[in-house]
């Protein structure tokens, strides 16, 4: 990749630093998409020994690129995102990926296709980490930032995505317990 091509790609990806997500940080500000992507990549790094048969380097690459479409559309929370939103994001993302030089263009497109199919262990791990990180982040935020429907969502979100792995199922149960403990400690503030 020529320096000018790298810089152009980085300038596009930089938008994720300012693209906020629905969730707040423990410090009380909106989390950025870049921070979310970084942390699921960190989760993949920490969990590499739990999945010795998986290509965790590939999982990490998936984690790093999974939300790049939000450079063009912004973040839409999962509970608000429509099929049209997903289609628009995918079209804009694939248009951008097509503008990248080889072999990056082909690798990214192959990763996105694999992630969408959710047939490989690597894609399943990435998707589970994506869901888990969102719930962990909500547990770290002040409960006053939770919307009413999130009390129930905190207890169930991502369960189907972790079911393939005993380790991730146990992690989901631990995160669920953190949610229950948080609600008990900070109180149910639903309106």
Q: What name fits each language-model region?
A:
Residues 1-191:
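Active-site helical microenvironments for divalent-metal-assisted chemistry
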């Amino acid at each position: 990749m020529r320096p000018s091509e790298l810089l152009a790609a980085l300038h596009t990806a930089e938008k994720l630093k300012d693209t906020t997500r629905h969730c707040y940080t423990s410090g009380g500000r909106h989390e950025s998409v870049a921070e979310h992507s970084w942390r699921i990549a960190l989760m993949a790094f920490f969990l590499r020994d739990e999945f010795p048969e998986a290509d965790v380097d590939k999982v990490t690459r998936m984690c790093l690129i999974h939300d790049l479409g939000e450079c063009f559309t912004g973040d839409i929370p999962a509970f608000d995102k429509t099929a049209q939103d997903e289609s628009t994001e995918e079209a804009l993302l694939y248009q951008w990926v097509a503008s990248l030089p080889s072999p990056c263009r082909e690798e990214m497109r192959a990763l996105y296709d694999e992630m969408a199919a959710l047939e490989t262990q690597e894609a399943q791990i990435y998707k589970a980490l994506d869901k888990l990180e969102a719930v962990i982040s909500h547990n770290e935020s002040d409960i006053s930032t939770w919307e009413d429907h999130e009390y129930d969502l905190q207890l169930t979100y991502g369960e189907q995505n972790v079911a393939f792995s005993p380790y991730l199922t146990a992690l989901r149960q631990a995160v669920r317990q953190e949610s229950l403990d948080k609600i008990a400690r900070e109180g149910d503030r639903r309106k």
